[in-house]
């Protein structure tokens, strides 16, 4: 008998009205058949999350950009684990157990992910949260094995303004044999804070989920809210949203180059990139009222229109910025720095595909996926994803430089021809489910939510870090210990969006 394919499994399932992609409810037998089918079919796992009675997964079929949402019931507190066939599911499964208490049957790793034993309750999103432990257990890590193996803990406190992440390295001399990340130190309780609120009220929490992707997260959340209620933002708002997203992309890429300059001692690179980023931040504040563009994108459109002279300010800033691109590229090509970055943090295409890594990391390794291809609003703009195949920091920086150039072109066209009309609509107090996505500076961002009479019953945001941190563990293995900070910078590792 021919085993069922994902297509036949979905065709035989109950489809729930979720927009723009239906959510398929699968009994455990069909969910296990899906797991078997994933052994042979190339669907990437985007996200895995839960509510009080079900577990949900979001899959992407790269070649056709097909998005698949599936769910299965939690029976006797458990559901069949996906991590055996999709390793990227492992941190999601650990997160689900921490927040809802659902157990991933046959999962290889059941250690806590977010819960460090410091919360006032356990299982905070379950119907019956438990009492906090009197003496919380410290995080556990595999024992170092082999002759002369030593352990080196790094973080979460580093004495710098940086993301709070704990890395446990196993070393042989100065070479890293294996690496394991432990996150959750910046958990904010975002999912609990959002429940019961309107999308417009919850948007403030989403805007603060990850500071360097505030526009992208807000945009994906707004699109999910609008899809759930079958509402569209006005044309002027859609154009402004695209402009804001590209402005954020340029700023974050410049921030990467500035950080790279600090870590490598390339003072010229740092000076050029930091100066350009500051110039863009001032223009953003003048045009939209916030240097990081926070709270501008909201469900229904944008919170306010561009300033009366905003288009002139942005175009003037772009004109000045264009002049910095040649010296920026020259600084990256300076022989000592170029030699240092060549081959750094190599990501094979197979690894990027296996873990579903997108953004600059995925495209720098040859994975041709950019969530903007799913965005109908980009349909009228000439745009093409930048792909490199070397998979190292040099390739990723080339992607960043060319994305900056592409963003300049997109913003220039948008700022010159903004449609007239309102910048927002009021969302109806209806019920429904929606999924939204946006291409953030570090990769694809996805939001799902369920609304009940205008209020959020359940929601989940998927940050690119869910794919990038497991990938970093593979990349760090074999690297030199002195390169850890540089590799973290190279891969664009952040934690706040993943820590929820």
Label each residue range with its predicted role.
Residues 101-110, 231-238, 290-294:
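Short secondary-structure capping/junction motifs at helix and strand boundaries
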Residues 49-51, 258-261, 293-298, 332, ...:
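Short coil/turn segments at secondary-structure boundaries
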Residues 1-173, 337-342, 350, 407, ...:
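Terminal low-complexity/charged segments
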Residues 106-114, 264-269, 294-298:
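Short, glycine/acidic-rich hinge or "gate" loops at secondary-structure transitions
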Residues 426-447:
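Flexible, glycine/threonine-enriched loop-and-boundary segments that flank and lead into catalytic domains
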Residues 37, 98-99, 224-228, 246, ...:
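Generic, well-ordered alpha-helical scaffold segments in large soluble proteins
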Residues 269-273, 277, 283-433:
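Intrinsically disordered, low-complexity regulatory segments
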Residues 150-258, 263, 272, 285, ...:
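Active-site- and interface-proximal helix/loop "cap" or "latch" segments in soluble metabolic
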